[in-house]
Regions:
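C-terminal catalytic "cap/lid" subdomain
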Residues: 1-105, 109-375
Length: 375
């Protein structure tokens, strides 16, 4: 653990995510003192010029509650978006004033999961963040709550933070919350202890992780944080999950929170968003042979292996690949429009090319555009 923590302290490019409960008062409004305390840590951590930090910050909806006369976070999307519209400006204004104490400029970046799943948007977001860092500005990222629909919302900023960490090729992801790590039981119960290190999913197989956030102003609990940590770790990025009051220790490599070891290698950007940020526009049901070929042998999906098609999608859209029981086994970018596929079902590419033309002698989903969901 000591060696891993040393590597954490030496990380150069870091994504830090802070949740609503770490930025708000007991009544749910934005707490200027807590914002200042976080900014103190972040500004000092990057003051030597050796670290670049991107902040993924919740709090827009929470910041908009009091000005709109709302006592608690609304459940309906329209009022959440109204609160975010008012609160996002207040949130960034608070950060701008706080960072100004260190003569640091703030840059606002608002994203939706749609931005992460469209290649051009994804590429532009990456360039913007890189340029902000190169120019010495401090990027503050949030979900664009005012335009996100139910279908394309992240639902929490934890998953967004994991994807941003991958997007900017971060050396470390730090998830700050109101709990100082993952525990082997309910943290409020005597006798439970903090889990210092998670080497892989099996380490948490017998741990019951609660689902609700403490303060009632955010959407994420420990479940979403652990899931985000797993996404980042699977993409080769180490993660520290701890409380906001221990942020300085986390950034310096101190023994705080729960450390998630990287479990995989860095994958292509688009495959990570394909698995975790894309919204499938339809599905293809495969026969048993095609499921084995795609999942076990990692081959491309050919027309011969398709049993049925559902949904309305265009070539290039993400679709789910399902087995005969309806279980999603993979996700991929389809090479045909939905209306073209019925005439291809169960047929060989050679026959299709002979009958319909050479452009039909291709895979329905190429193996380079596939991610396996259930091996």
């Amino acid at each position: 653990v000591a060696g891993a923590r040393q590597a954490v302290g030496e990380a150069r490019r870091i994504v830090v995510k802070v949740g609503s409960s770490s930025l708000t008062t007991a009544s749910g409004g934005l707490d200027a003192d807590r914002v200042d305390a976080l900014v103190d840590v972040l500004a000092k951590s990057r003051s030597g010029g050796e670290k670049e930090i991107v902040l993924v910050s919740s709090g827009a909806i929470a910041a908009g509650l009091a000005p709109l006369g709302l006592r608690r976070r609304p459940k309906d999307l329209a009022r959440q978006q109204a609160a975010a519209s008012v609160g996002q400006g207040l949130l960034v204004a608070r950060y701008t004033a706080s960072f100004a104490r260190y003569a640091v400029r703030v840059g606002q970046v608002l994203l939706t999961s749609d931005d992460m799943s469209r290649r051009a948007h994804h590429r532009n977001a990456s360039r913007t963040l890189d340029k902000l860092l190169a120019m010495g500005a401090f990027p503050i990222v949030n979900e664009n709550d005012t335009v996100a629909t139910d279908e394309i919302r992240f639902g929490d900023n934890d998953r967004l933070a994991a994807l941003v960490a991958h997007l900017v090729h971060a050396d470390l992801l730090v998830l700050l919350s109101d709990v100082d790590g993952v525990y082997d039981g309910d943290p409020s119960t005597p006798g439970t202890s903090r889990i210092a290190e998670v080497r892989g999913p099996d380490d948490l197989a017998h741990v019951e992780i609660g689902s609700a956030g403490k303060a009632g102003v955010g959407t994420g609990g420990m479940v979403t944080k652990v899931e985000a940590a797993r996404i980042a770790a699977a993409a080769g990025i180490p993660v520290v999950l701890t409380s906001a009051v221990h942020a300085a220790d986390a950034l310096s490599g101190g023994d705080t929170g729960t450390y998630f070891r990287p479990t995989g290698k860095r994958s292509a950007d688009r495959l990570l968003w394909l698995q975790h940020a894309s919204t499938p526009q339809g599905s293809l049901t495969l026969d048993d042979g095609a499921v084995r070929a795609v999942v076990e042998r990692r081959t491309s999906l050919l027309p011969a292996g398709i049993a049925s098609v559902e949904g309305e999608f265009s070539a290039g859209d993400p679709v789910e690949l399902r087995d005969a029981r309806g279980r999603a086994v993979a996700r991929g970018l389809v090479n045909f429009d939905a209306k073209e596929i019925p005439q291809l079902i169960g047929r060989s590419t050679r026959d299709l090319a002979r009958e319909l033309g050479a452009e039909y002698e291709r895979e329905v989903v190429h193996r380079d555009d596939l991610v396996i969901l259930h091996p």
